[in-house]
Amino acid sequence: MKSGTLEKKVDASSRQVAVPLTIIMLATASLHAAVDISSADAQRIGKRIWQNECGGTISGLTSWNVGENFASLGIGHFIWYPKGQRGPFDESFPKLIRFVSAHGAKLPQFLLPGHDTFCPWNSRVEFQQAVDSPKMKQLRQFLVDTIDLQTQFLIARLQDALPKMMAQASDRENVQRQFDRVASNAQGCYALVDYVNFKGEGTLPTERYHGEGWGLLQVLENMHGAQSALDEFAASAKTVLRRRVANSPPERGEARWLSGWLARVDGYAK
């Protein structure tokens, strides 16, 4: 299997896909919050998320976790369902493909328009058996070549998240205030981008256990300004994640992931 680390490959990605990561502004007609993410900060965010999701390795860009019915691909472990399989979680890999294609990335033949949009491997067993197949190697190389664009996609997701959350928030003023507090520095921008990729916006009705969500909206709604912004964000995220695991279907065995999830959000305050 081809291996490597993000430190060795990220510069190559930047050369192969020459799309600048510039200031990203989040705003709507009625909301005046903005998040400024410089090109350098964006690259650091992409590296940290790659480390979080894939251990910073090339092999980790193509994964299929035990107990899941979907592949997890790229630096953000974007979800890709096989044909006939669905679940409560938002399928993000096809959206990534459309995004990078629109920004000029060259797609592998089997990802071009007109081909089947479903994951070509039907199970984790099939996926693992194909780990060194030509198709998997093409996919892995494509993911290496588009690391910068994947980071842009992650940031764009945060850009789209705020109006979605505000449309559903029970206390819009508080959600706006907490978002602005967290977004006031580079570390907070990383926390927002990482969490919305990690656990979603919190706006999909399918992403609920016993009616309780676990996305960015729920984290912000649980904040009230009692601590420093990043300390409170991390504490609120841990509360939301513990609640998710407590509410989760037993057959998913989500408790096995909780310690890793909590360690990840602890990093937001450091």
Predicted regions and their residues:
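A general, composition-driven signal for non-globular sequence regions
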Residues: 2-3, 9-10, 26, 171-175
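Bacterial N-terminal signal peptides
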Residues: 18-29
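Bacterial N-terminal signal peptides that target proteins for export
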Residues: 4-20
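Extended alpha-helical regions
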Residues: 1, 6, 266-270
